[in-house]
Regions:
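Acidic, metal/cofactor-coordinating or nucleic-acid-engaging core segments within structured domains
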Residues: 5
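Conserved catalytic cores of very large enzyme subunits
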Residues: 11-13, 18-229
Length: 229
């Protein structure tokens, strides 16, 4: 009631309305979906003293909300970009007190929250979409230590998107990481994971991979390379 700026007042009222709705009720817009994802992430962190709690294949499950709002003229790409940069800044605020040695070696006190984009659909088509580009751009703009950004790479990945990934890597802040679908998916299948689930894997923590809500194994040794071999 005390806010005098009309635009800011409208924003605050919209925030209040959204926060009173999600995640108890389903999200119906991109703004609501982003807020719902944040609330769930925060609740999980608090409830479980969380570690390596990751966002999964963000560009896949958020894409329908994004495109619906874009097509209906409710948001622009720039609006979505701003919302995502705000989400990543909030993600960075989740923290734990670490030892001095860990803090020095880990560029602060990261919680190893990971966001996965790219990859393939369950019918083996390239999964890169418009939101994949927006997520990549938002991470490039913020250049934060959290969340980690992982791009699932495969032979038929959108060339323009992969070129953009390389440009972001050249900025020098260590992201995005690349996960090779053509190695990881067969590995999951060899472990007995169903093919449709293997194609839906995402990165968690530093370098681990899992199928969201279905299968996970902290095979941290996957980051080691056998150079002689």
């Amino acid at each position: 009631d005390k806010e005098t700026d009309a635009k800011r007042k409208e924003e605050l009222l919209q925030m209040s309305k959204i926060c009173a709705k999600v995640p108890y009720e389903p999200a119906n817009s991109f703004r609501e979906a982003v807020q719902s994802v944040w609330f769930i992430q925060l609740i999980l962190q608090i409830e479980s003293n969380g570690h390596s709690l990751s966002y999964g294949r963000f560009d896949q499950y958020m894409y329908p909300y994004y495109m619906k709002d874009i097509n209906e003229g409710k948001i622009t790409k720039e609006d979505a970009l701003e919302l995502l940069t705000c989400l990543w800044i909030k993600t960075l605020t989740i923290n734990k007190v670490r030892s001095q040695s860990h803090t020095l070696s880990s560029a602060g006190s990261p919680m190893y929250q990971n966001v996965t984009i790219g990859g393939q659909t369950t019918d083996k088509k390239d999964a890169v979409n418009e939101l994949s580009f927006v997520v990549l751009q938002s991470v490039a703009q913020t250049r934060l230590t959290q969340p980690n950004l992982t791009v699932r790479y495969h032979a038929n990945i959108d060339k323009h998107f992969f070129d953009e990934c390389i440009e972001v890597m050249k900025l020098g802040f260590g992201m995005p990481a690349l996960n090779n679908d053509e190695i990881i998916i067969p590995s999951f299948i060899n472990w007995g994971v169903k093919e449709e689930d293997a194609y839906n894997y995402s990165a968690i923590g530093c370098v681990e991979t899992a199928v969201p809500g279905k299968w996970g194994y902290r095979c941290t040794g996957m980051s080691y390379m056998n150079f002689p071999r």
